Amino acid sequence: MPEQGLKTLPHQEILTYEEIIRVAEYAVRNGITKIRITGGEPLIRKGIVGLIERLHRIPGLVDISLTTNGTLLEKYAHQLFQAGVCRINISLDTLDPERFRTITRRAVMDDVWAGIRKAEATGFDPIKLNVVVLKGVNDHEIPDFVQLAKEKPYHIRFIEFMPTGAGPYQKEHYIPTAKIIERVRKVAGISSLPPHINDGPAKRYKLEGGKGSIGFISPVSSHFCDTCNRLRLTADGKLRSCLFSDQEINLKPILRSGSKDIEAELKQQFQQALSTKPAGHKINSDKIPPLGRTMSGIGG
């Protein structure tokens, strides 16, 4: 997190909930079955629970999940569950309060843990904890996260450090998944699990003697571009077919045009996004192209 915080968008630049629902209804009618709500931090937007309730009522949508930093989860966990959220992902890169404060610039780790406990008590299952592993920053905590998965029914997902668009990519902090697995095997027995429909890009492993499981996401060392089936809609109405490409299509003019044939125009733009989806990203090349947006502005 930059010390000065993140630049916010003017209210009029952000899609209204009506506009989001319009896009979601079109997408679901044309084959999308899952929606993930991300950020930034989605729970800071007023009325988010109402949006989820409306999404949940769309015929054909079978799964709604949410990624959060957890700071407001204690307040919203029960409402989210009732609204139709099926699964929760919580970004948590450290178990150490001081390191948490250094990484996030906020002393709110107690709030995050209160949110995790509330989500568990509410009935969310699975609860996934996303851990970006950084050499020299938090990699020594790998055994601690493994121990947490032994004690709690959480899915710990170790994620390779990758470019986020927020300044230069500090490659010295990168650790490939193979090395992370080696570190895990030093403290626990793990065995690969068959793929599950809700795994996404993660490869899951059973943790011997554990209540939870371990997963690995390898966007740099073993990218999953050939199986990527995701589209992203940013808060300001841009449709993106790749997390690591600045190629995007602005849907906002269509949604605000007053046209009687918005459906046909959305179809054209969705088809364009899908037909121009890159075959693969370039983040593991020597010269990494800079991203025009931070990851928080895209929805990682």
Residue ranges and their predicted role:
Residues 1, 77, 104, 243, ...:
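Short, flexible helix/strand-to-coil boundary loops that buttress conserved ligand/catalytic motifs
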Residues 1-15, 243:
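Canonical Radical SAM [4Fe-4S] cluster-binding loop centered on the CxxxCxxC motif
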Residues 14-37, 44-159:
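Radical SAM/AdoMet-radical enzyme domain recognition
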Residues 34, 91, 99, 213-216, ...:
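Residue-level recognition of specific faces of alpha-helices
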Residues 60, 154-155, 189, 275-282:
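Generic structural signal for secondary-structure transition and capping sites
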Residues 98-101, 106-113, 117, 121-215, ...:
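Radical SAM enzyme [4Fe-4S]-AdoMet core and its adjacent flexible, acidic
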Residues 223-300:
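Radical SAM enzyme core and accessory elements
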